[in-house]
Amino acid sequence: MRIAVIGAMEEEVRILRDKLEQAETETVAGCEFTKGQLAGHEVILLKSGIGKVNAAMSTTILLERYKPEKVINTGSAGGFHHSLNVGDVVISTEVRHHDVDVTAFNYEYGQVPGMPPGFKADEALVALAEKCMQAEENIQVVKGMIATGDSFMSDPNRVAAIRDKFENLYAVEMEAAAVAQVCHQYEVPFVIIRALSDIAGKESNVSFDQFLDQAALHSTNFIVKVLEELK
């Protein structure tokens, strides 16, 4: 099976890249694509760059050029739910934009005109990801909504405003909704799997720098387990 794995930053893709066999890397429009073999699958690992425009552009190139059967977006995120701690893992049930507001024209907050309010992750991939983490004892794994915007959420006032908009939000980051929207339009199944590097609004910038490598390791180990179980 041909599986695409997307991470925004070098820290988020480096460990998985080192695990690929017969790896070949090429750069297209500033985006790094590495093809290789892992767990019996052909894996295309994309380093997309940070933010929604980079994520949308690179995911479009990915789907047009490499035609993966499934897409997994991984990396770090900021925790939003009160039950979460740094290092925990969130599996997306749906993904929304948290910085889109066209409510003046009767759209839901976060809804892009012409698109659904949220982008539903593939149920089979969500179930498989959840199954892969059942044996984990030291990492809390939850599933729920992930929201995306082109801002790092370190301002407590902005965090509070987004919490008011999305009651059941578990994590925020800067690429997933763009990846999900492109996958939705191409009808390619996707899931977002993010490990928490910080808790939004609580000295997030300090925590992010300190725990990014830990989050990257957790998310990469999780991705490998999913690939090993994926049939």
Curated annotation (Swiss-Prot):
One of the Pfam families matching this protein, by short name: PNP_UDP_1
GO biological process, one term: L-methionine salvage from methylthioadenosine
GO cellular component, one term: cytosol
UniProt key word Ribosomal protein: no
Pathway named in the protein's UniProt entry: Amino-acid biosynthesis; L-methionine biosynthesis via salvage pathway; S-methyl-5-thio-alpha-D-ribose 1-phosphate from S-methyl-5'-thioadenosine (hydrolase route): step 1/2
The enzyme's E.C. designation: 3.2.2.9
Catalysed reactions, semicolon-separated: S-adenosyl-L-homocysteine + H2O = S-(5-deoxy-D-ribos-5-yl)-L-homocysteine + adenine; S-methyl-5'-thioadenosine + H2O = 5-(methylsulfanyl)-D-ribose + adenine; 5'-deoxyadenosine + H2O = 5-deoxy-D-ribose + adenine
InterPro entries in the cross-refs: MTA_SAH_Nsdase, Nucleoside_phosphorylase_d, Nucleoside_phosphorylase_sf
Keywords: Amino-acid biosynthesis, Hydrolase, Methionine biosynthesis
GO molecular function: adenosylhomocysteine nucleosidase activity; methylthioadenosine nucleosidase activity
Record: active site: 12 (proton acceptor), 198 (proton donor)
Protein name (database record): 5'-methylthioadenosine/S-adenosylhomocysteine nucleosidase
Organism for this UniProt entry: Bacillus anthracis
Organism ancestry: Bacteria, Bacillati, Bacillota, Bacilli, Bacillales
